[in-house]
Amino acid sequence: MPLPPDLHVHTEWSWDAPSGDMEHSCERALEIGLPGIAFTEHADWVTIHDGQHVLDIAGFHQAIERCRAKFKNLQILSGVELGEPHWYPEPTRAVLAAGPLDRVLGSIHCVRIADDVVDASQFRLRPADEQPGAIHEYFRETLAMVESDEPFDTLAHLDYPKRYWPEDMQPYREGDYEEEIRAILLAAAHRGLVLEANSTRGEEGKLCPGLTVLRWWREVGGEAVSFGSDAHRPDKVAGGFGLATQVVQAAGFKPSADPMSLWRR
């Protein structure tokens, strides 16, 4: 089965991708036979990490056009990954107004815990009695974003905290959060969003979301799934896609004749 386009890739234009390279990512996409690639750079306004900076959206658009001119046999899409866009509506809309974008991802990375803003990758560093509540807060914040009127088309890495689940805790089980996850999926389906299958960790246990949630997505009426490696360097483009396509197909979604199309029910 041919690989689908990778619709979630970061390059040197994202603050957390020092090894990213747009041109080399295009070369990698052609090398492995992808029909297309979407560069979805971080547009984040929570500043809790060292080296964080605002996306140079004008420079990004210029780089996209250079790559389109150079790699004519690859469909290159422009995009952004909006972090907590419902917290920052004005800068979000400014980024979206700066030029045409083919893909706009909505993501939750951070939540508010007491007086702190905490990235979900750092939940494991919080006191043990805070961690279960932090996961529930993550899903509450995701629902708030989906129910907001912020303009994005794809819900990215729905159960992002699973990537960083502490090995000394009980295994992550979707069923423990089923009510919250289904509420998010239902709201996303009503809004007509695409659900991303994020393969950044490769193995099925860390596919975000996994088979169980992808099946729930179909049950609540979700229409489409996209594939995103969340690559932050060229050699990771489409990483885990072989397995991800099998899982998405097992959940009841299938490709169309157009290799650039989303997978649908």
Locate each region found by the language model:
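An N-terminally biased module of ancient metal coordination in phosphate/nucleic-acid-related enzymes
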Residues: M1-H86, L96, D102, K162-E178, ...
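Short, basic, glycine/proline-bearing loop/turn elements
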Residues: H8-E12, I76-V80, R126-E130, E196-R201
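Active-site-adjacent C-terminal substructures of enzyme catalytic domains
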Residues: G175-A238, V247, K254
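C-terminal regulatory/interaction regions
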Residues: Q249-G252, L262-R265
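Extended substrate/RNA-proximal surfaces in nucleic-acid metabolism proteins
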Residues: D50-H190
